[in-house]
Amino acid sequence: MRSRLTPQRITVHSRSVLLEAAAQVIRFSLAAWVGGTLVVVLAAPLLFGEIGSRDLAGRIFGELLRRFEAVKHVLSLAIVLATFAELETTRSLEGRRFVAGAAAFVAIATNVYLAMVVRPRLAYFRMKVGSFDETPPENPWRVRFNRLHRRSTVILMIGWISAAVALAARPN
């Protein structure tokens, strides 16, 4: 005897529950992204100002960034899945929802670029520099590191602003 799976009907009530759940997941994920980035931005000057060794401060802050990027990967997945659930339910991406979706896409793209391209290059340059406490500022590897570090800071800010725009643009 074969068992049959009967398709379940999606009711108006279940659609509204799914839509609300997706919206809450997106709001929470974007709020965590924006708040977490604020903590990281505030922690950097504190760590580098209070810890005497740039090498030690860099190792601590680098690990903080690595862990936060892992959190942002999970948040990115939640945002994407919840956005797909919204699209499946509403069948549209217009107005504020489009702005929020586009901004969330930019935020996610910045995180992927930082994690997959920039951070590995920074790690390589850091390895080539050796010690930031002992290597002179004009060292070519340190110059490359500093240039890429400035770019990574700008990209982080773009992602932060994009996540904030996505959060603010979300329809109520």
Language-model features: locations:
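Physicochemical signature of membrane-embedded alpha-helices that form the seven-helix bundle of GPCRs
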Residues: 25, 29-32, 103-106, 151-155
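Individual transmembrane alpha-helices with interfacial aromatic-anchor signatures
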Residues: 64, 140-159
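Hydrophobic cores of alpha-helical transmembrane segments in multi-pass inner/ER membrane proteins
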Residues: 77-79, 159-163
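Alpha-helical transmembrane bundles and membrane-interface segments of multipass inner-membrane proteins
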Residues: 100-101, 110, 114, 162-165
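Mid-bilayer segments of alpha-helical transmembrane spans in multi-pass integral membrane proteins
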Residues: 105-121
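Juxtamembrane boundary at the C-terminal end of a transmembrane helix
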Residues: 166-172
